[in-house]
């Protein structure tokens, strides 16, 4: 079963057929930052349009979101700082982010007539470079040394975690279990890759060594747990939980909440109450550089 959404392009904009059918006409998107210790929330942006998947800049001075196939910079006071490489980047989906040194932007683009493939571009300027010839490939993580990308890809009917040199080259399969493996992201020390997997029949959070060995399940509940993002101090992960079984999918417009796991004790706490979200809420890394805040998108009907 193809568990990643089928994507179409409309006037150069990328959106999944499933998400397109789920977005209400009166939708509002709210860009929020949350203090993980106090649970204080600040609304950065609230607009009557659909945007997704915030990243925090490595300097901490702006947030990066995708909307209508483009990438936009938003300051922490809600000011629109413009599109990122508007003449070079289009058809972007919600899998994008920055290298640890902040010098490289990585993004997944739904190429016309094809499916998602992964590109890089120097943040100071240049031309996008295609990294994955094969498709579909959905980027999620880059190693701390900047040398390796990890991503979810479908090859021969199986959705697994793959790795590839950031400069391009041979891709390496890291997982081989039945069912969808998705959302791979490196810890800040580079020792682990965190990901989510449907291998047990319910989506749960896992981690493995950077070479794919020692795969370990971390969550064991009746929620559907997606997109683990390790903190800068390597002590915790934040992830999104669907309250109901989504059968291996991560749809838009469902009851969800954000949760935090202490990796030393394995204790889990809720960071938010239940809200309307899912696809687009926190698909990619969104920790602030100091590890005190996370960014996410809450939707309103």
State where each predicted segment sits.
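Multi-bladed beta-propeller domains
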Residues: 33-50, 75-92, 121-136, 164-180, ...
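Residue-level detector of Asp-centered blade-edge/turn motifs that repeat once per structural unit
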Residues: 58-59, 100-101, 144-145, 188-189, ...
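Conserved beta-strand position repeated across blades of beta-propeller domains
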Residues: 55, 97, 141-143, 185, ...
């Amino acid at each position: 079963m193809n568990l990643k959404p089928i994507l179409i392009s409309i006037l150069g904009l990328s959106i999944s057929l499933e998400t397109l059918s789920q977005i209400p006409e009166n939708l509002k998107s709210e860009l929020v930052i949350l203090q993980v210790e106090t649970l204080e929330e600040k609304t950065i942006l609230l607009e009557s349009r659909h945007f997704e998947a915030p990243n925090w800049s490595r300097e901490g001075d702006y947030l990066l979101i995708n909307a209508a196939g483009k990438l936009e910079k938003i300051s922490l006071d809600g000011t629109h700082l413009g599109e990122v490489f508007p003449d070079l980047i289009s058809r972007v989906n919600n899998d994008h982010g920055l290298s640890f040194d902040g010098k490289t932007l990585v993004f997944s683009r739904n190429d016309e007539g094809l499916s998602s493939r992964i590109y890089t571009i120097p943040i100071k300027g240049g031309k996008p470079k295609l990294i994955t010839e094969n498709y579909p490939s959905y980027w999620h993580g880059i190693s701390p040394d900047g040398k390796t990308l990890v991503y979810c890809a479908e090859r021969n009917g199986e959705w697994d975690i793959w790795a590839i040199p950031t400069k391009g080259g041979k891709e390496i399969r890291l997982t081989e279990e039945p069912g969808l493996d998705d959302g791979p992201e490196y810890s800040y020390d580079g020792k682990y890759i965190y990901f989510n997997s449907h291998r047990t029949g319910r989506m749960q959070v896992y981690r493995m060594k950077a070479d794919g060995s020692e795969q370990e399940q971390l969550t064991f509940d009746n929620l559907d747990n997606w997109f683990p993002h390790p903190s800068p101090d390597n002590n915790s992960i934040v992830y999104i939980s669907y309250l109901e079984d989504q059968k291996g999918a991560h749809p838009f417009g469902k009851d969800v909440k954000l949760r935090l796991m202490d990796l030393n004790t394995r204790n889990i706490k809720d960071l938010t109450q239940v809200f309307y979200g899912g696809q687009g809420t926190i698909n990619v890394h969104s920790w602030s550089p100091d590890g005190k805040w996370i960014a996410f998108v809450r939707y309103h009907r």
